[in-house]
């Protein structure tokens, strides 16, 4: 289960020699090993209107994950700087990004199409997930409080300083249960591992083993059956 799109998750997983299906975009899409979508739950027009209103009111830029790649309302240079910081291998402090860092940033940034607003995403594009990064943690808390008034939108975070938004039916835990049910796998036979708030929907009692990583957020450790050392 990943918050990433298939295109972002597959190279990492396959590079480790693992061959499997993928629950992507925080549960909004389930894909076969070769990337064919089996099921998908996009954001509805009502979801999009609420997300646009709340994030725009707060001055928050968006990464918009769609059927046609990622659209971004951030100013291009600002988004690129955030990507550099995310992938920094220590070379930024020396004032000269390493070749490996430049390559990573170029590869990641190539997936983005920059637009002025959510309304500029081409008509007919299916939108699965919207997120934003490097937000003050207290602002994330306030945003989640505002979205709590939208019961058909699920909110999550990989870090305390980001926010991820999907349809309420598109959550990792729900997608994992559906995936297992189709294959006659009982929840009690499943081991779940996670480290952040966006894994919470999988950390429910019916799963046999819920394992929080040693560096997991406290909210996950509080509900996990086990914790790594």
Regions found by a protein language model. Name each.
Residues 58, 65-191, 202:
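Conserved acidic, metal-coordinating active-site core of Asp-based
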Residues 31-34, 166, 220-227:
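Short, charged, surface-exposed secondary-structure boundary motifs
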Residues 19-25, 155, 210-214:
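Short hydrophobic/aromatic-enriched beta-strand-loop microsegments
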